[in-house]
Amino acid sequence: MGLKYLVWMCTRAEEYEYAFSLGGGKPLSEELTSEEAKKLFNAAADFGVENLFITGGEPLLRKDLLELIEYASAFGLKLYVKTKGWRINEEVARKLASSNCKVIVSVAGLEKVDDTLRGEGAFKRSINAASLCSKQGILYSLSVMNTKYVVNQVRDLVGLALKLGSEGFSLECLIPRPVHIEEQRVKLVPLEPTPEEREKELNELYLLSKQLGGRIRITPYDMQYNRVLKTKEPWLTLRGRCEIRNNLEADEWLEVLDDGKVYCCSPLGLAFGDVRRNPLDDVMERVRSSDLVRKLADRINIKGKCRICEFNGICGGCRARAYVYTGDMFASDPACPYRPATFTV
């Protein structure tokens, strides 16, 4: 018993609407209340959750967030909050540190890109927050949303994370959540890097991880990175990055959205319960017994080049990205430029 990762999107509220906002950046009227959030933390502790990630929207727009984090810390959960950081000052950073809560500060790129996508002054506010968190020893990661605008900024962004004293750097994928999907497609598709640009980024991050020799944890959240690793270092034994598949082997990952629904893969819309009504162990049992989850986890069911790819076992392509951009969750990952030797159109 025990879940490695529980992610709670506590609100979709934002200071204002921008490129990555959900539902116009307005909070949902039925988001979990303070008491319901505390019940979720109780349930998480009972279920043996190791890592609790709190995301948004902008989590710090919840007036009860610091109180909730302090409450959760009493259970010994490893806590992380992902934020733009605009509402972090010295006092907030100290309070987060006192609750042993690590902070992931998100930016959309270097200053010009970040200010273009998130508003003038956005970058400086986020970097100031990162510096304050670093001084408290709680800067877990500098997180960057992967768009076509950061393709040539990866090296400088990793360097910035190092300069800030961050434990890590992560590159996130632009994959819509299961709300306002059509609206998100309109906003996000034009921002996507091409498959070739994505390949360039992943190879650059591999080189940086070797050059920096463990000075910083570099995490590209992309299924294809396993293929890059295996190509560079064939002797490596790698585990697949698909949480759908991993949930069948162990209690790996669940995501709770602001309305309380629980997903094993939110972009696919695979909800298996509601924290207001369903215990987490019941939710996980539903995940494991789902015919669709088992079908998705069995890579023999994937279509196109992903099915015959020699890296199928450690990659298999992102099922969510296939679904969002092709309408078929079993289709080949449209973001991958790799062509298996046996593939013919």
Task: Please give the residue ranges for each predicted region.
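Conserved alpha-helical substructure of the radical SAM core
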Residues: M1-S99
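Short loop/turn motifs at secondary-structure junctions
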Residues: G2, E17, G48-V49, S99-N100, ...
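A structural signal for isolated positions on well-ordered beta-strands in alpha/beta enzyme cores
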Residues: V7, F53, Y80, I104, ...
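Residue-level signal for the nucleotide or nucleotide-sugar donor/cofactor binding architecture
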Residues: L32, K63, G121, Y149-N152, ...
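Flexible loop residues that form catalytic
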Residues: G57, A108, L174, I314, ...
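Radical SAM enzyme [4Fe-4S]-AdoMet core and its adjacent flexible, acidic
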Residues: S99, S106, K112-D259, Y263-N278
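Accessory C-terminal segments flanking Radical SAM cores
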Residues: D222-F343
